[in-house]
């Protein structure tokens, strides 16, 4: 018979306070400044993990592209990437920047170049100047002897105009000359690596080798960001762990072609969550395929929510809501939770400027008496709506104290006003701080 000292129950009792660790410290990296006018976004170093996005408009449509960039910036995107693939697109970039400046949108723009970037940056100096950062893909910057020359031309443009670059490797467009050479070298090994390991190594060598070549050409390490994008969760984790171990460059995280809807969100969250928890990653982009007619801003919100739920940054007040069960026969709490979440998101462009700190606020919308009062007390503001068979009243808690009870048909409107009043009362306007 098992003694008390050996029982599972007693072994779970700690005599000393256990160490409950959170995410690991951020990996040390070079800080890369990306600027436009007075707007400075630093990637890496001790800067917060940045959220960026990409337009899906025809860049040659300057007005349409500027409108979408403004939407992404208003949603909280700190950098916005645009495709620069044709002379028409390159010619439109200065007009896009001018439109944004007139609208008061100072978000830095990143030019996404493939195949012909060396020509576009040379032939359209206005484009080269209007962009704040260039994305270069080593896999398609040129083939054979042309590759080094064309890569050098892009790096020289970045140095000339003092622009940051992202050297972005993608396994769908990996440098085939490099991969073939590495496959041959692997075949000559006494104990050849698996094909997957060779692929990982090729991605990493392409990124780091290209970055070191850029440094040789005169670009500072504090002007370079690296990425090695793949579409598999475990592949991304494996590649970035090794990439992060082997270099000090700032790293851009993203699962390429993550997919649509919940699948894309889950895949991106699973991959980035592991890496961010380990302190790897300085900027993220969530590559979601939007549903027809859906706003492009969804990828920004998902990126923000990943960082916020992990406790790495705060972007908007968090709404805590129960999932519902047999005790919550009414849909009122679901509708209220959705309404409050939408309201908070809509207010953030103004609140972010006027009420610093509001992004850390928590609001609880609960559906019955089981967890409702408790969760509501833990939040800054909480409401516990009545469940099935309960008294048709909704107690409201502010900073842990019950302050009033709402009844009737206007619970949603009254609670929204309570939230608004709380924000105005507890988060000082910026002009009052100056």
From Swiss-Prot:
Species of provenance: Burkholderia ambifaria (strain MC40-6)
This enzyme's EC code(s): 1.17.7.3
Protein name, as recorded: 4-hydroxy-3-methylbut-2-en-1-yl diphosphate synthase (flavodoxin)
NCBIfam families: ispG_gcpE (TIGR00612), PRK00366.1 (NF001540)
Binding site for [4Fe-4S] cluster: 322, 325, 368, 375
Domain of life: Bacteria
Record bears the keyword Nucleotide-binding: no
Biased composition (Polar residues): 1-15
Reaction catalyzed: (2E)-4-hydroxy-3-methylbut-2-enyl diphosphate + oxidized [flavodoxin] + H2O + 2 H(+) = 2-C-methyl-D-erythritol 2,4-cyclic diphosphate + reduced [flavodoxin]
Region Disordered, residue ranges: 1-24
Keywords: 4Fe-4S, Iron, Iron-sulfur, Isoprene biosynthesis, Metal-binding, Oxidoreductase
Single GO biological process annotation from the record: terpenoid biosynthetic process
Protein's job: Converts 2C-methyl-D-erythritol 2,4-cyclodiphosphate (ME-2,4cPP) into 1-hydroxy-2-methyl-2-(E)-butenyl 4-diphosphate.
InterPro entries xref list: Dihydropteroate_synth-like_sf, IspG_bac, IspG_bac-typ, NO2/SO3_Rdtase_4Fe4S_sf
One GO MF term: iron ion binding
Cofactors demanded by this protein: [4Fe-4S] cluster
Primary enzyme class: oxidoreductase
Cofactor binding remark: Binds 1 [4Fe-4S] cluster.
Pathway the protein acts in: Isoprenoid biosynthesis; isopentenyl diphosphate biosynthesis via DXP pathway; isopentenyl diphosphate from 1-deoxy-D-xylulose 5-phosphate: step 5/6
């Amino acid at each position: 018979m098992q003694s008390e000292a050996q029982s599972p129950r007693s072994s779970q009792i700690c005599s000393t306070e256990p160490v409950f660790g959170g995410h690991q410290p951020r990996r040390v990296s070079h800080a890369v400044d990306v600027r436009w006018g007075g707007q400075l976004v630093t990637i890496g170093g001790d800067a917060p993990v940045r959220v960026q996005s990409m337009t899906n408009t025809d860049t040659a449509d300057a007005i349409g592209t500027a409108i979408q960039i403004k939407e992404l910036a208003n949603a909280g995107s700190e950098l916005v990437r645009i495709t620069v693939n044709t002379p028409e697109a390159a010619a439109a970039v200065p007009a896009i920047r001018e439109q944004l400046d007139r609208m008061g949108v100072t978000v830095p723009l990143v030019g996404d170049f493939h195949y012909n970037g060396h020509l576009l940056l040379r032939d359209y100096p206005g484009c080269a100047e209007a962009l704040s950062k260039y994305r270069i893909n080593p896999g398609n910057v040129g083939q054979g002897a042309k590759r080094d020359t064309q890569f050098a031309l892009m790096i020289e443009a970045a140095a000339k105009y003092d622009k940051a670059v992202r050297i972005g490797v993608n396994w769908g467009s990996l440098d085939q000359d490099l991969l073939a050479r590495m496959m041959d070298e692997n075949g000559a090994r006494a104990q050849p690596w698996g094909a997957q390991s060779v692929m990982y190594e090729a991605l990493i060598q392409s990124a780091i080798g290209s970055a070191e070549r850029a440094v040789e050409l005169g670009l500072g390490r504090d002007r370079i960001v690296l990425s090695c994008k793949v579409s598999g969760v475990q592949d991304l984790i494996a590649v970035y762990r090794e990439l992060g171990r082997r270099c000090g460059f700032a790293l851009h995280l993203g699962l390429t072609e993550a997919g649509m809807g919940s699948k894309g969100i889950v895949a991106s969250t699973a991959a980035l969550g592991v890496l961010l928890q380990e302190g790897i990653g300085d900027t993220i982009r969530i590559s979601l395929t939007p549903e027809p007619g859906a706003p492009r801003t969804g990828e920004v919100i998902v990126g923000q929510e990943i960082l916020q739920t992990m406790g790495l940054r705060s972007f908007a007040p968090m709404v805590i809501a129960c999932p519902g069960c047999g005790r919550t026969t009414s849909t009122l709490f679901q509708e209220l939770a959705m309404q409050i979440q939408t309201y908070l998101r809509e207010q953030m462009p103004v609140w972010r400027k006027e009420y610093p700190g509001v992004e850390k606020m928590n609001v609880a919308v609960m559906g019955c008496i089981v967890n409702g009062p408790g969760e509501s007390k833990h939040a800054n503001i909480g409401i516990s709506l009545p469940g099935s068979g309960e008294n048709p009243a909704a107690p409201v808690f502010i900073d842990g104290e019950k302050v009033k009870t709402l009844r009737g048909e206007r619970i949603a409107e009254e609670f929204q006003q309570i939230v608004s009043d709380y924000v105005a009362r507890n988060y000082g306007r910026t002009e009052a701080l100056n």
